[in-house]
From Swiss-Prot:
Name assigned to this protein: Protein TMED8
Location of region: Disordered: 1-78, 232-267
InterPro entries per UniProt: GOLD_dom (IPR009038), GOLD_dom_sf (IPR036598), Golgi-PI4KB_interaction (IPR052269)
Domain GOLD: 159-323
Record's compositionally biased regions (Acidic residues): 238-254
Record keywords, A-Z: Acetylation
Modified residues (N6-acetyllysine): 169
Keyword Membrane: no
């Protein structure tokens, strides 16, 4: 044993002397070296792949299990984009490299169309031909797009005072002798007597009677400036009244823009008229129908005698209309 150890010596080691042990140690060192080299190659490949992915896909796919990272520069740019309302601020953001040039151009265009802050949504309409942009408010009341066509309710009317008296023959004989106190309302017709308010009066009064048959009667008030105190009589067919009502409804439903000069500045007809007394059939052939109403203001009273429901008979009407102070 000593000769063998001496023969081998520390400086004369040979891999063939102990093939099993020497070969085992050598194999282990070779495997570890090859694994280290392979891992280094994989690291280099992973680095190249990550660099290539970052160059070709700058925005990584979002994952529901991974929090999103927001760049502070992009966030500040978004806040500055919201706050920037003028061209000077947009130019300042461009100099600070916080806002792209194309976004600055958009802000410059938007700064030309500033509107006052109002309640409601803002609607921007761009013309297809000229490219001009109109800024409108969705709040029609504040934008005044309806002009004079707002549906304003008329003031409430005080109820009239009405009464009857039985001296029909005396009343008709007296008025039959006076001029412009007797007329015939033909079948299917509506007669409207227009009575303006008088500057020296405070109330309007009416009295009327008919021969043999009743007639419909109602009182309305037209809120319109008075240019003449003359009493006028207007005769219309029932179909004409229906056509006029349909036209009035169409005019109300189709508001006219305030800037349209050709269409004029018509007011809402429904808000112009007040109802003092609705049209009902009155037994004017039995008793004299009388009444009065205090002036609500300046305007014209419309006394309607309605015979549109009668298809066969004409009605002879005796009436007396006056004012008192």
């Amino acid at each position: 044993m000593s000769d063998l150890q001496a023969a081998e010596g520390p400086g004369s080691w040979s891999p063939t002397a102990r093939p099993g042990s020497a070969g085992g140690v050598g194999d282990c060192q070779g495997v570890e070296g090859s694994q280290a080299a392979a891992s280094e190659n994989e690291d280099l490949e992973n680095k190249d792949t990550s660099l290539l992915a970052s160059a070709t896909d700058p925005e990584p796919c979002s994952s529901p299990h991974r929090p999103q990272m927001v760049s502070p520069v992009s966030k500040d740019a978004t806040e500055d984009l919201r706050k920037a309302t003028g061209p000077l601020e947009a130019q300042a953001l461009v100099k600070q490299d916080l806002l792209p040039a194309d976004q600055a151009q958009v802000l410059n265009e938007m700064a030309k169309y500033q509107v006052p802050q109002r309640s409601g949504d803002i609607v921007m309409i761009q013309s297809e031909h000229t490219g001009a942009i109109d800024v409108l408010s969705a709040d029609l009341e504040s934008a005044d797009l309806l002009g004079d066509h707002r549906k304003v309710s008329p003031p409430l009317m005080a109820p009239p005072c009405i009464w009857t008296f039985a001296k029909v023959k005396e009343f008709k004989s007296k008025l039959g002798k006076e001029k412009n106190s007797r007329l015939v309302v033909k079948r299917g017709e509506v007669v409207t007597i227009r009575v303006p308010t008088h500057p020296e009066g405070k109330r309007v009064c009416w009295e009327f009677a008919t021969d043999d048959y009743d007639i419909g009667f109602g009182v309305y008030f037209d809120w319109t400036p008075v240019t003449s105190t003359d009493i006028t009589v207007q005769v219309s067919d029932s179909s004409d009244d229906e056509d006029e009502e349909e036209e009035e409804e169409e005019e109300i439903e189709e508001p006219v823009p305030a800037g349209d000069v050709e269409r004029g500045s018509r007011s809402s007809l429904r808000g112009r008229y007040g109802e003092v007394m609705p049209v009902y059939r009155r037994d004017s052939h039995r008793d004299v129908q009388a009444g009065s109403h205090d002036y609500p203001g300046e305007g014209i009273y419309l006394l309607k005698f309605d015979n549109s429901y009668s298809l066969l008979r004409n009605k002879t009407l005796y009436f007396h209309i006056y004012y008192t102070s």
